[in-house]
């Protein structure tokens, strides 16, 4: 599949428009439970000087996107109250239906810092890449994350002190997350600005492995999946192989192409480890391409999403 074939040919009308400049959180999609690996800082690179609605040009942040803060209804209730999910949408200015990428966040490291649960995840670099090519980008926040309702309960230890390395608890958390992905997908398909014939799903870290498992469950909706450094539990965790390989193998049920993007010096998943997950996926019948990205010296490969020079050409050819 070639992403360029999904893009409208009409140019973007970006002139004489003024947009509210909002400071957006570009973190919170980091690790995936357990201890990080040695050899790289677990912190993301410095924040982009422009937010997701603008692009740096000659030292000035040039407006490129319209931001929409929305809420997706779900079939879930907690304590007798309906649960809705925060969805941050960026799209080109003007009316119309746009090819859409739904991009899912990761975890919060090891799950022990509750102050991170309320941070809303968006990616300015990914947004600019897609919006400038005529796409709508949606960033859903799963239950208990960002400004979404509900309890954040994606595979915690029984005392909720952090993410669990136990296979049963971790996979139960993944199933809960996949239910959220289903609810958001259903809601997006009803929006007037979404071209439901041209949709991709993607994510980073936990969001990446969720995108693979989800696309196999909704092949009638999505044309492909973008997996940035995907995994559910870090390779330092006890049951990591059983957990991650189970979810990767599930993604093999999708009949279309998938794209796997992993960085060297990743503090949670080494390249050989991630390639083993890809092998499990392909042996199970999955279709995909595995790419190794090399970030700048000293940068943590788990945050390659922040450097489009590493992956823009690869996605363009996908």
Spans of model-derived segments:
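Short substrate-entry loop that stabilizes the transition state in hydrolases
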Residues: 96-98, 107-149, 234, 268
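Bacterial signal peptide processing site
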Residues: 28-31
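C-terminal motif of bacterial Sec signal peptides marking the signal peptidase cleavage site
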Residues: 24-26
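N-terminal cap/lid segment of alpha/beta-hydrolase-fold proteins
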Residues: 47-96
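C-terminal catalytic histidine-bearing segment of alpha/beta-hydrolase fold enzymes
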Residues: 284-318
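Primarily recognizes the serine-hydrolase "nucleophile elbow" in alpha/beta-hydrolase
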Residues: 179-253
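The feature captures the conserved acid-bearing segment of alpha/beta-hydrolase catalytic domains
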Residues: 224, 229-289
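Alpha/beta-hydrolase active-site loop
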Residues: 155-192
């Amino acid at each position: 599949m070639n992403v360029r074939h999904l893009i409208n040919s009409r140019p973007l009308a970006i002139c004489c428009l003024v947009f509210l400049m909002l400071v957006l959180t570009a973190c919170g999609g980091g690790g995936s439970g357990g201890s990080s690996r040695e050899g790289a800082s677990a912190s993301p690179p410095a924040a982009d000087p422009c937010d997701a609605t603008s692009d740096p040009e000659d030292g000035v942040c040039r407006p490129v996107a319209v931001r929409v803060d929305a809420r997706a209804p779900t079939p879930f209730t907690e304590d007798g109250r309906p649960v809705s999910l925060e969805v941050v949408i960026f799209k080109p200015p003007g009316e119309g239906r746009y090819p859409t990428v739904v991009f899912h966040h990761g975890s919060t490291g090891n799950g022990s810092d509750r102050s991170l649960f309320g941070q809303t995840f968006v990616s300015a670099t990914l947004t600019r890449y897609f919006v400038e090519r005529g796409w709508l980008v949606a960033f859903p926040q799963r239950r208990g994350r960002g400004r979404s309702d509900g309890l954040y309960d994606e595979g915690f230890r029984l005392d909720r002190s952090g993410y669990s390395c136990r296979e049963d608890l971790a996979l139960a958390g993944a199933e809960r997350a996949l239910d959220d992905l289903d609810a958001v997908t259903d809601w997006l398909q009803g929006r007037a600005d979404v071209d439901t014939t041209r949709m991709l799903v993607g994510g980073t870290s936990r969001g990446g492995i969720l995108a693979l498992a989800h696309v196999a469950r909704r092949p009638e909706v999505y044309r492909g999946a973008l997996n940035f450094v995907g995994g559910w539990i870090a390779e330092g965790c006890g049951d990591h192989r059983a957990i991650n390989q189970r979810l990767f193998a599930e993604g093999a049920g999708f009949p279309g192409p998938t794209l796997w993007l992993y960085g060297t010096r990743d503090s949670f998943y080494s390249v050989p480890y991630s390639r083993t997950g890809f092998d499990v996926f392909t042996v199970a019948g999955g279709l995909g391409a595995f790419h190794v990205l090399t970030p700048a010296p000293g940068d943590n490969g788990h945050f390659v999403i922040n450097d489009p020079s590493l992956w823009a050409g690869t996605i363009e050819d996908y």
